[in-house]
Curated annotation (Swiss-Prot):
Function comment: Catalyzes a salvage reaction resulting in the formation of IMP that is energically less costly than de novo synthesis.
Lineage: Archaea, Methanobacteriati, Methanobacteriota, Methanomada group, Methanococci
Gene Ontology CC terms: cytoplasm
UniProt cross-references to Gene3D superfamilies, sorted A to Z: 3.40.50.2020
Localization terms from the record: Cytoplasm
InterPro entries: HGPRTase-like, PRibTrfase_dom, PRTase-like, Pur/Pyrimidine_PRTase
CDD domains found in the cross-reference section: PRTases_typeI
Protein's recorded name: Hypoxanthine/guanine phosphoribosyltransferase
Keyword field contains Magnesium: no
Subunit structure as annotated in this protein's UniProt entry: Homodimer.
Gene designation per UniProt: hpt
E.C. number: 2.4.2.8
Catalytic activity field: IMP + diphosphate = hypoxanthine + 5-phospho-alpha-D-ribose 1-diphosphate; GMP + diphosphate = guanine + 5-phospho-alpha-D-ribose 1-diphosphate
């Protein structure tokens, strides 16, 4: 199995803001450059791990978009993006999102009661975004079949499972130690 993701994480830059060390990576930030080979590797691995007998894939704006696009093209499953702005469409579901570094609203459109869905996102750290997505999908009456994040950094998996009952799958677990990304699994 290819390990492009893991190798790219080991060499990505780290920036410190306050006391927090951010890793800057193409999948989580879209910079410095998103290589097709990396996106292809990730989407291939994702497809092997998720239920593909679903109606829709759901992600939050913004960095889940390249991932769901690649998975959608490969599987012919359409996707829905929870946006950060309101569109005022009929049936739109607003949900409050709180992460370790921001607060705001997300807006869900395009989900019908009974839709079988998979949630995909780029990074889980505090779990706040995933909890918001899951709550919105439950309000819409969706049948959540799988939840997967590419990169796991922090305790978000446990928080999501405690708050929602859903287990979050991930491709890689990391932590930042001494200014470098360490691969834990």
């Amino acid at each position: 199995m290819s390990r492009l993701l893991e190798e790219s994480l080991k060499t990505c830059p780290i920036v410190k803001r306050g006391e927090y060390h951010y890793f800057i990576h193409p999948i989580s930030d879209g910079v410095p450059l998103v290589e097709p080979e990396l996106l292809r590797d990730i989407s291939t691995r994702v497809i092997k791990m998720i239920d593909t007998e679903v109606d829709k894939i759901v992600t939050a704006e913004a960095m889940g978009i390249p991932i769901v696009t690649a998975v959608s093209i490969a599987t012919d499953i359409p996707y829905v993006i929870m946006r950060k702005r309101e569109y005022l469409l009929e049936g739109e579901i607003p949900v409050h999102q709180e992460t370790g570094y921001s607060k705001g609203e997300l807006y869900l459109n395009g989900i019908n009661k009974g839709d079988k869905v998979v949630i995909l996102d780029d990074v889980i750290s505090t779990g706040g975004t995933l909890v918001a997505i899951i709550n919105a999908l439950k309000r819409a009456g969706a049948d959540i079949r799988d939840v997967l994040c590419i990169i796991d950094r922090g305790n978000g998996q446990n928080i999501v499972e405690e708050k929602t009952g859903y287990k979050v799958k991930t491709l890689v677990k990391i932590e930042v130690v001494d200014g470098k990304v360490q691969i834990l699994k």
